[in-house]
Curated annotation (Swiss-Prot):
The active site is at E205 (proton donor), K337 (proton acceptor). Catalyzes the reversible conversion of 2-phosphoglycerate (2-PG) into phosphoenolpyruvate (PEP). It is essential for the degradation of carbohydrates via glycolysis. One of its GO terms (biological process) is glycolytic process. HAMAP family: Enolase. This is Enolase. It catalyses: (2R)-2-phosphoglycerate = phosphoenolpyruvate + H2O. PANTHER family: ENOLASE. It is found in: Cytoplasm; Secreted; Cell surface. It comes from Sphingopyxis alaskensis (strain DSM 13593 / LMG 18877 / RB2256) (Sphingomonas alaskensis). One of its GO terms (molecular function) is phosphopyruvate hydratase activity. Binds a second Mg(2+) ion via substrate during catalysis. It comes from the Bacteria. (2R)-2-phosphoglycerate binds at Q163, K337, R366, S367, K388.
Length: 424
């Protein structure tokens, strides 16, 4: 009854107006699943390959008709007849069919679309929400959001090199309250920027991209907005950064050009340590470049005992890279992006490995998103306790927050919002 009878892919547009892959999976009993695949702007060199057409005469080369053809051709032919409830068999069949180490033949965007749509169809067949189908009866922890309210780096056209400045409403009592707090701080920040004559247009992830002078300038602006909104910085709300340091690592130096700095890995670690000392920053993502293992080790040794150090480009949601990082003592947290590895099974393997090593895990969106809210369900399914899904603007970001509010309501008294407990 849960055999796959049809798989259909199509080309749709993401939140940046670029093509992406959407997949429908239909089962023998009429159950149905649909998934749309996200896309990143700052991508790690070790991510699974997103297959693009390269035809400059169509969508400026960003079309995904090759990936869609893979879904409707090779993948559909291989998977029709398989049981949608056997997620690992489905995912392994696609990995074997692709036959490359980075999913470059069929495309991770094709493979992931099918993987997630099959899981949704299986959940539909069971009459279960996706978070319950994937996570079982223990799936009840709502994630604390990292809300990206000021953008720099690859996500903005301003002098700030750090890519994301985020607030985390750890003092809230529920996800619904956390979203309210975030919204109030977001609008307070907007008013403050406007009063200073600074831009209030939003970037890819819904955050503002004002022409501020430095990292500390951005942190001070956020701190003032938290206070003006009526919350206590360091207790109600803490801060988080995504440096995306790979983007400004050149010739062995971290070029923080907006501040006129050229730092060695050791100096970069000290730079971040000083920020953690002066502000209630509880989480730093990609504080070092993806292959600067010595830098990562220095940073982890320096502040890993007091600050969550999240590996995004470092680990790319890849169990093999994560395993090596754990052995080498690099970072203490895994950023989870389903399209970095390309299947649901491998994503869950990475989260499980992180948890067994006492690393935290943070479920994450990409800068190019859609209305698909799958990551909200996966955050609850994995009990990871944290989610990155942008600011309090743009419907592609709010779709995830709204889904979390619905899940919390559905769980009722079983729902748990961990707050500051996520940091131990």
């Amino acid at each position: 009854m849960t055999a796959i009878i049809d798989i259909h892919g199509r080309e749709i547009l993401d939140s940046r107006g670029n093509p992406t892959v959407e997949v429908d999976v239909l089962l023998e009993d009429g159950s149905f699943g649909r998934a749309a695949v996200p896309s990143g702007a700052s991508t790690g060199a070790h991510e699974a390959v997103e297959l693009r057409d390269g035809d400059k005469g169509r969508y400026l080369g960003k079309g995904v008709t090759k990936a869609v053809a893979a879904v409707n051709g090779d993948i559909a032919e291989a998977l029709v007849g398989l049981d949608a409830e056997d997620q690992r068999e489905i995912d392994m069949a696609m990995i074997d069919l692709d036959g490359t180490p980075n999913k470059s033949r069929l495309g991770a965007n094709a493979i992931l679309g099918v993987s997630l749509a099959a899981a949704k169809a299986a959940a539909d067949a069971r009459g279960l929400p996706l978070y319950r189908y994937v996570g079982g009866v223990s799936a009840r922890t709502l994630p604390v959001p990292m809300m990206n309210i000021i953008n720099g780096g690859e996500h903005a056209d301003n002098p700030i090199d750090v890519q994301e400045f985020m607030i985390m409403p750890v003092g809230a009592g529920s996800i619904a309250e956390a979203v309210r707090w975030g919204s109030e701080i977001f609008h307070t920040l907007k008013k403050g920027l406007s009063q200073k004559g600074l831009a209030t247009a939003v970037g890819d992830e819904g955050g503002f991209a004002p022409n501020l002078a430095s990292t500390r300038d951005a942190l001070d602006f956020i701190a003032a907005s938290v206070d003006q909104a009526g919350f206590k910085l360091g207790t109600d709300v803490v801060l988080a950064l995504d440096c995306a340091a790979t983007e400004f690592f050149r010739n062995g130096k971290y070029e923080i050009s907006g501040e006129g700095l050229s730092l060695s890995p050791e100096q970069m670690a000290e730079y971040l340590a000083a920020l953690v000392k002066d502000y209630p920053i509880k989480s730093i993502e990609d504080g070092m470049s993806e292959d600067d293992f010595a830098g990562w080790k220095a940073l982890t040794d320096l502040i890993g005992g007091t600050c969550q150090l999240v590996g995004d480009d470092l680990f790319v949601t890849n169990p093999a890279r994560l395993e090596q990082g754990i052995k080498d003592g690099l970072a203490n947290s895994l950023l989870v992006k389903v399209n970095q590895i390309g299947t649901l099974s491998e994503t869950l393997d990475a989260v499980d490995m992180a948890h067994r090593a006492r690393y935290s895990a943070v479920m994450s969106h990409r800068s190019g998103e859609t209305e698909d809210a799958t990551i909200a369900d996966l955050a609850v399914a994995t009990n990871c306790g944290q989610i990155k899904t942008g600011s309090l603007a743009r419907s592609d970001r709010l779709a995830k927050y709204n889904q979390l509010i619905r899940i919390e309501e559905e769980l009722g008294d079983m729902a748990r919002y961990p707050g500051a407990a996520i940091f131990g």
